[in-house]
From Swiss-Prot:
InterPro entries: Cyt_b/b6_N (IPR005797), Cytb/b6-like_sf (IPR027387), Di-haem_cyt_TM (IPR016174). The gene is qcrB. It holds the Pfam family Cytochrom_B_N_2. It is found in: Cell membrane. Keywords: Cell membrane, Electron transport, Heme, Iron, Membrane, Metal-binding, Respiratory chain, Translocase, Transmembrane, Transmembrane helix, Transport. This is Cytochrome bc1 complex cytochrome b subunit.
């Protein structure tokens, strides 16, 4: 609200310049009320809440460096003869895109560093999103009311992957061209429409003369534009929902305990931005990434050895590499299952992320809002699902780099391929079972700690000769944190025969839901929390050390 016009301070002379600018802006944008409502917004403190910030800052760094690259990059596949300062490629024929990337690397001031920062920031951005997503998943921060924000995040992840892929393809070097060839193969395996899509995308026969300029618009405009919109929406929703917090004394589902946005959080966040920028710059200055001059220009009849996509695309590469080369030939057509099946599984691996919050809320039937985070051990089935998914992902990542594993560790490539084929099915099951057991073990340990205190490491000898370890009682805060979680009862189908003896039909989905609910909250899936009576009984000193 602007009150400058009728303020008595006028009589004391002109207000300071800053205040006048603020008044001017307030009259047009209403910033006072906006700031009043949001400046004291509270953010809880936990190291894992910095992961979203890492994504944000690396995205900003990508945009800043990307703009610089656009000043010198020529998105054209026209053939030129190279006459830049990199001697080994002098006189070679190559696309303008490749030649301009060489120029960025050798002839543009600061060009190589900016290219390196752009590429490293992209890798860290995707890694940041991946780990941030894991933080959100394992703590249950995707539950109501944050499911939509989870979907926004999911879209950011998928779009980030494709933005990275299109960027990787721009320099038109032998490695990026091989990646595009891989994509063309996958598109061609789609029955009926595959050839049409490929011709449409490449403007004719692969590789054609168009894909760099097309990918360029997609890379610098379309995808980052959509991502920017989603990102703003994502952050507005984080603001609107307020941040979740871990259980602790004084923290409830209705409050947020932490630091105010201004000045504390803003100062911390500003500092953290420079830290992220600094680390990415140092890494980029030390570790070469994508030395396109050593890889050479793209020629469709050549493939470089050890060809690898960037890490976030590795799992899709793994799917293709380990799939048996099955084919069906019928009516003069070939269905290449060896490529088409991986192409179908690829979106399924990703879709599992998108749908999980909705599946969990359906199974648990929980319609309440959740602002207090779970400790992963207290949600064993969810944690086990997460680890099973990660297992599939990392097993496929091994498959994607099977040649590198083979050469670096002197292993047989066939043995690795078979390992991945078997582990793709067995790995997640073993991971699920093991994770659940570990979670339950940790729950038991928590219970033990609450009832008997912390093992102090001090061994005492009693007068009659027995050795015991002295247990120290936990503080009230620790007790609160270890016992704050809710424990649900599994949803039951209820009696199938009513009081009049009429049988009720139970549908398959109801049965499935009850079974899954049992897996989430049944006796096998949670260790009952210690009750107040149990605690009192034990701590009152009857029969315990
Ligand atoms: C461009 C990428 C992304 C950026 C810049 C970003 C940024 C952020 C920031 C700054 C926060 C608050 C701090 C924190 O909890 O870390 C946050 C929270 C959140 N993010 Fe992201 N995020 C991104 C991607 C994702 C992805 C991939 C997912 C999941 C699939 C996701 C889901 C969420 C959810 C559900 C919250 C609310 C968490 C809570 O209140 O505890 N985000 N995000
Ligand atoms: C999430 C967003 C983005 C990701 C993940 C990403 C990733 C990449 C990657 C991995 C490369 C290959 C770099 C190399 O040569 O080794 C690249 C190239 C490039 N990117 Fe991006 N980028 C993103 C956004 C942008 C934006 C917003 C712009 C421009 C405003 C941009 C402009 C460029 C240009 C001009 C190139 C080609 C030059 C070169 O390869 O050095 N990028 N990008």
């Amino acid at each position: 609200m602007s009150t400058a016009a009728n303020e008595p301070s006028r009589s004391r002379g002109k207000a300071p310049a800053g205040e006048r600018v603020a008044d001017w802006a307030d009259g047009r944008l209403g910033i006072y009320s906006l700031a009043k409502a949001n400046m004291r917004k509270i953010f809880p403190d936990h190291w894992s809440f910095m992961l979203g910030e890492v994504c944000l800052y690396s995205f900003i760094i990508i945009i800043l460096t990307g703009v610089y690259l656009t000043l010198f990059f020529h998105p054209s596949m026209a053939e030129v003869e190279y006459h830049g300062s990199y001697v080994p490629l002098q006189g070679q024929m190559m696309s303008e895109a490749y030649a301009s990337t060489l120029d960025i690397s050798f002839d543009v001031r600061g060009g190589l560093l900016i290219r390196q920062i752009h590429h490293w920031a992209a890798l860290i951005f995707l890694a940041g999103m991946f780990v941030h997503m894991m933080r959100v998943f394992f703590t249950g921060a995707f539950r109501k009311p944050r499911e939509v924000n989870w979907l926004f995040g999911f879209l950011l992840l998928v779009l980030g992957m494709f933005t990275g892929f299109t960027g990787y393809s721009l320099p038109d070097d032998l490695l990026s061209g091989t990646g595009i060839r891989f994509m063309e193969g996958a598109i061609l395996s789609v029955p009926i429409v595959g050839t049409y899509i490929s011709f449409f995308l490449f403007g004719g026969e692969f590789p054609g003369h168009d894909f760099v300029s097309r990918f360029y618009s997609i890379h610098i405009l379309l995808l980052p534009g959509i991502m920017l919109g989603l990102l703003v929406g994502h952050l507005i929703l984080v603001f609107y929902h307020k941040h979740t917090q871990f259980a602790g004394p004084g923290k409830t589902n209705k409050n947020v305990v932490g630091m105010p946005l201004l000045p504390v959080y803003t100062a911390k966040a500003g500092g953290f931005f420079f830290l992220v920028f600094g680390v990415i710059s140092v890494v980029s200055a030390i570790a070469t990434i994508n030395p396109i001059w050593a890889i050479g220009p793209y020629r469709p009849d050549q493939v470089s050895t050890g060809a690898q996509p960037d890490w976030y695309m590795g799992f899709s590469e793994g799917l293709i590499r380990v799939m048996p080369g099955w084919e069906i030939n019928a009516w003069g057509h070939t269905l290449v299952l060896g490529v088409f099946v991986p192409l179908l599984i690829f979106p399924l691996v990703l879709a599992a992320i998108a749908v999980y919050p909705f599946i969990e809320s359906w199974v648990t039937g929980d319609k309440r809002e959740h602002h207090i985070l779970d400790r992963p051990r207290n949600a064993p089935t969810r944690t086990a699902f997460g680890v099973a998914w990660l297992t599939v992902y990392f097993v496929l990542l091994i498959g994607g780099g099977n040649d590198l594993w083979a050469t670096h560790f002197h292993l047989s490539i066939n043995a690795i391929t078979w390992f991945v084929r078997i582990a793709f099915f067995v790995g997640p099951v073993v991971a699920f079972i093991a994770t659940k057991r570990i979670c339950l073990g940790l729950q038991r340990r928590d219970k033990d700690k609450v009832l008997h205190g912390r093992e102090s490491g001090i061994i005492k000898r009693l007068p009659h000769g027995e050795f015991i370890e002295v247990h120290e009682p936990l503080s009230q805060e620790q007790l609160h944190t270890l016992t704050a979680h809710e424990q649900y009862q599994p949803a039951e189908i209820g009696p199938t025969v009513d009081e009049n003896g009429v049988e009720r039909k139970v549908s398959g989905t109801q049965k499935l839901r009850a079974k899954l609910s049992e897996s989430y909250y049944g006796e096998e899936s949670q260790i009952p929390k210690p009750t107040v009576e149990e605690y009192k009984e034990i701590t009152s000193g009857h029969g315990h050390h």
